[in-house]
Amino acid sequence: MKKIKISPSILSADFSQLGKEIKRLEEGGADMIHVDVMDGHFVPNLTIGPPVIKSLRKYTSLIFDVHLMISPVHKYIKDFADAGANLITIHPEATENLKESLDLIKSLNKKVGVSLNPKTE
């Protein structure tokens, strides 16, 4: 039987203590760390960018499951890959060419994810 993987989000973490929060998740059995990236444009909220993700790498070797809620997403994929994302999830609505963006993620040796909005036509 396949093992279920746990990927808790750091969105509700204390952003002034992210290193400690990630250590707590790791000690609690997390398999991955889910990072919600929001730009205040594609979605109304604003969170973190590549420099923060890069700075968190020193606290864990767990997979960073980075969910990009930004537009235009294609422009920033490499920045997040270089910062330490292992899995990059994007929204079709945030890119002009979904296949091209997914191919870019794969070319950077990262796993890909697509987040679907049921209301999108």
Task: Tell what function each PLM region has.
Residues 1-89, 93-97, 104-110:
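Conserved N-terminal beta1-alpha1 strand-loop-helix module at the mouth
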Residues 102-114, 118-121:
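Anionic-ligand binding region
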